[in-house]
Amino acid sequence: MIASLRLGLALALLPLPAVAQRSDALAVERAALTMRPGAHRWADDPTLPGPVSIVVSVPMQMAFVYRGDVLIGATTVSTGKPGKTTPIGEYAILQKRPFHRSNLYNNAPMPFMQRLTWDGVAMHAGNLPGFPASHGCIRIPTAFARALFAATALGGQVAVVNDVIAFPAYRPADPVPRLEAEVAMLAGRDDRVSSGGRRGEPR
């Protein structure tokens, strides 16, 4: 009897970490729904499995941070203003510097800089007016930038999307890679190369 009670108790306790993780993720999601410019929420648990990845929603002016598939942080952002828009796409963190100055824009300070491209796009601490205002970078609050800088690794995945993320507590699926071919490089009806490698006769 005692043994069966102990077994039942042990089984009941097994899912608690997963329940707690999902509960924390939902709390971050709820906070994100009412954030004002400059607001953020960080609830990382370094014991969670999986790498840290980031999804930036340009229309929402929000970023969501995941460890594995669990939402651990959300923040307001300021992306690129008209004419200097932040490019949509999948990126890897190429460089990290706790303090950096822009070599493109008047030596502007870029604390907790995490570079996404070699031509001027990065995540860093900066001013958040509530609308796209940067020269292409993704500005985030200083406290959030510090925590994010400590959590990420070189090569970490960052997705900049032009979508509204309805349920950020559940990490969006990675986009299916799109294969594109250069039409001029494809074999066409005017190709005259035979299987033997010699120019064939026209049909």
Feature annotation, model-predicted:
Residues I2-M113, W118-I138, T142-R203:
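N-terminal pre-domains immediately preceding structured catalytic cores
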